[in-house]
Amino acid sequence: MSSHTEYNSIGRAKEGSTDVWITPLYVVEFAQNRWNEGNPFDLDAAADADNKQAPVFIGEDTDALSVDWAEHYIEAIIDDPSFTDLNCENVWLNPPYGRQMPKFLQKAYEEVQAGSVDRVVCLIACRTDTKVFHDLIFSNASEVWFIKGRLSFSGKGSANFASCFVVFDKRRENNSIAINYGPVKEEIE
């Protein structure tokens, strides 16, 4: 049994939860260009069929906090001849934005530390005063990218909070963290 309290993959306690923020395509494209050489992510670790940002995703019917993400990926593609690489290297994560967000970030870090995946790029609400920033992100992330302005999430309009990318990468050097900032739209145009 996982040490995490069980949540479905997009953290919904009930239909229509306010924890679900669907990522705008330009944000995903920016992340793909910056951290994945323009390639699509292998796995979206918190999605549903309507908002997935990778060909394979962990949906509402699976507890994303208790499954091995690389194993989930392999099980999803093993019989599909269009996939030639069984490695789940780059994961996209726009976790639920409620109390379970720190649990998803901890899981992302654990997946990288265990060697299951190479990199997890997370889009989160930028709340640098929180415990998760001080205890997990600042001491373990390879990069934090503070996004200029507020994002407009699909179906929700502009967020009432700042956003940032947090990247956990197995290639992190010297236990250092890169801090960057800027717009995401201009970077991909």
Regions found by a protein language model. Give the residues of each.
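Class I S-adenosyl-L-methionine-dependent methyltransferase catalytic core
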Residues: 1-189
